[in-house]
Design a protein with these regions (language model features):
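Surface-exposed loop and turn segments in beta-propeller and other repeat-based domains
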Residues: 2-9, 69-73
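Beta-propeller blade termini
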Residues: 14-25, 51, 80-89
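Acidic/hydrophobic-patterned starts of short beta strands in beta-sheet-rich repeat architectures
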Residues: 25-34, 90-98
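Beta-propeller blade repeat segments, especially FG-GAP/WD-type strand-to-loop junctions
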Residues: 1-2, 41-67, 103-119, 145
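Short, conserved, GDST-rich strand-edge loop motifs in beta-rich repeat architectures
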Residues: 34-42
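Secondary-structure transition/capping motifs at alpha-helix termini
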Residues: 22-27, 56-61, 86-90, 113-114
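C-terminal cell-surface addressing/anchoring modules of secreted/extracellular proteins
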Residues: 206-236
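Gly/Ser/Thr/Pro-enriched helix-cap/hinge segments flanking short amphipathic alpha-helices
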Residues: 69-212
Length: 238
């Protein structure tokens, strides 16, 4: 258990949602908790957004700082559902919160306006003969110019009875992209080069090349070997 070392303290909270996403586009994954007390006997509890500050003390564990209050999204309402999506298509992920004690709230992210980093949004499109239509379960790796590799899975459903945009969202910091690597659920890996930053990339699944059937050739060779082995015996009997 490394949460205390990382600065993540949620032991006394009632957490309904947990999301890793790069809210500030700096290239590392931040951590969101949607929190809501379940009855009047528990004191008001606040949502948390832990900003990933990297490994500040060299212990091999990323250090996190809760910035939800600073950003104005802490609140004390019962946040029982959260969905992430870039609703305004500006390149950063916005947060939709559903509460049991008030109406839905949509928080617009201003990371792009603040110029904190570049981004990439990947939409996977599987085929009938390959993976599923949204590429659920597939692995996406973004290889950056400095050698960093960003890795995410495509998934469906998160938190308490929730689901977010199926697009896979990457914050890139100030890096450019060398190439993209998609491993489909078929096991086939597809490479995409010349990928632009600050763009939406639609990836159509490539099916693996068909496996060649050599059974007819193998049967012919085995038959020939058998004939050669039996030929002396057949000659003596004739």
């Amino acid at each position: 258990e490394a949460s205390d070392q990382a600065g993540i303290n949620t032991n006394i909270l009632v957490n309904w949602d947990c999301h890793f996403f790069d809210y500030d586009l700096d290239g590392d994954m931040d951590l969101w908790f949607g929190v809501g007390r379940i009855n009047q006997y528990i004191s008001n509890q606040y949502n948390s957004l832990y900003r990933n500050d990297g490994d500040l003390n060299g212990d091999g564990i990323p250090d996190f700082t809760d910035v939800a209050g600073e950003l104005g999204i802490a609140g004390t309402n019962k946040t029982m559902g959260t969905a992430l999506a870039d609703y305004d298509n500006d390149g950063d992920l916005d947060i939709l919160m559903a509460h049991s004690d008030r109406s839905v709230i949509l928080w617009r992210n201003t990371a792009v306006e603040d110029g904190t980093g570049a981004w990439l949004k990947v939409r996977l499109h599987g085929t009938e003969l390959g993976s599923n239509s949204h590429g659920i379960g597939c692995l996406v790796k973004v290889h950056l110019e400095d050698g960093t590799v960003l890795v995410q899975h495509a998934y469906a459903g998160d938190g308490f009875l929730g689901s977010s945009d199926p697009a896979i969202h990457f914050g890139l910091g100030n890096q450019t992209i060398e190439y993209l690597e998609v491993t489909w659920s078929t096991g086939y890996t597809q490479i995409i080069e010349e990928v632009e930053t600050n763009s939406v990339l639609n990836v159509e699944e490539e099916l693996p090349p068909p496996v060649k059937d050599f059974s007819a050739y193998i049967l012919a060779v085995l038959s020939l070997i058998l004939i050669l082995l039996l030929w002396p015996l057949l000659q003596r009997n004739s």
